[in-house]
């Protein structure tokens, strides 16, 4: 095994060569997050933050070869690992055999005795607050302040890309800052299952239980993907009970409320509801603008407010797609040598995204929207389009009219015809009612978002 000093020199040379040969954005995205875990038997073990980056790294053999000959005087091969592909046991093994120390960073947190999987870049300070996440953010801060005491478990639900995972990491990072010896683990439900299956296959259940049942904080992401296998569910049930009984904090996320998790048993679902269940909805216009302003500040390009306003008006689904849209606009601007990004450039960059959205809705019909709304509110199709006017029917009818107008752009008279021959002024009133509610009524925002996701 190479000495610690040699390993540090080797990795420093790899990164130096990379900085000299590739652009800053590529370096920051592909190279900077990578870690050298060890050099064993002429093989460098490199840990990436995502398996999606392996293809890029496979093309960087010249970096490894050159640095290997310069530092070790011999040929060095390399093996790639990825955080999102490794089981906890494998990652723990890699860390234990690691022979290179982390370089000190001003923002680094003291290491936890257990590999936590936390991402340092997610904290409460850089989480943008808005009407759709205000109460969930408050709950997350309360949990981080008094883990195991305030809301346990904390169950956060909402659509993809709205910030659920960000808040999970923020909770973990805050607790780790306050208590550097805290035993914290962030894991997806899929990786929990993988850890359990591997532990069972390798007869290492004692290690698995020690890993999970002695935590101070368990952050379990995307529980809707939990396996329906009996053994896995039993193990998680026992893990949940063990942690809860000893006062450890549990935070869970899902794309739906606990009662809609059909792959889980009632006994688990009921436990998810013991603490606080809270949701995150799509960001409103002001929140989207705030997110874009913050993100654009780190760009070398200038984004006038009217350009950011245009982008915010085009992307209203979730934060992830909003950030992706900004990145795409920046890429197009750089490719065309544009320093001050105008609306025309943004429109050009986002044209293909809008076309893709339109294509995904090309098979959507008025009838499909009506059926989905009727199903969502548990009323019949005939009541939805019929003459009945009680609130529990009139409100879903207004929602359906709003969605038809919003998603399909159907004319007001045509919508009226599809809803039992109603006058176009009735449709106009319904559309205005729901449009007004969408500005400040979180329940309506949540309903619209949930129904849209069905499409």
UniProtKB/Swiss-Prot annotation:
Q: Which family does it belong to?
A: Belongs to the DnaA family.
Give the protein's function: Plays an essential role in the initiation and regulation of chromosomal replication. ATP-DnaA binds to the origin of replication (oriC) to initiate formation of the DNA replication initiation complex once per cell cycle. Binds the DnaA box (a 9 base pair repeat at the origin) and separates the double-stranded (ds)DNA. Forms a right-handed helical filament on oriC DNA; dsDNA binds to the exterior of the filament while single-stranded (ss)DNA is stabiized in the filament's interior.
UniProt-listed CDD domains? AAA (cd00009), Bac_DnaA_C (cd06571)
Question: Region Domain I, interacts with DnaA modulators: which residues?
Answer: 1-77
What organism does the UniProt record list as the source? Lactococcus lactis subsp. lactis (strain IL1403)
A GO CC term?
plasma membrane
Question: What's the short name of a Pfam family annotated to this entry?
Answer: Bac_DnaA
MF (Gene Ontology) = ATP binding; ATP hydrolysis activity; DNA replication origin binding; lipid binding
Example GO BP:
DNA replication initiation
Q: What is this protein called?
A: Chromosomal replication initiator protein DnaA
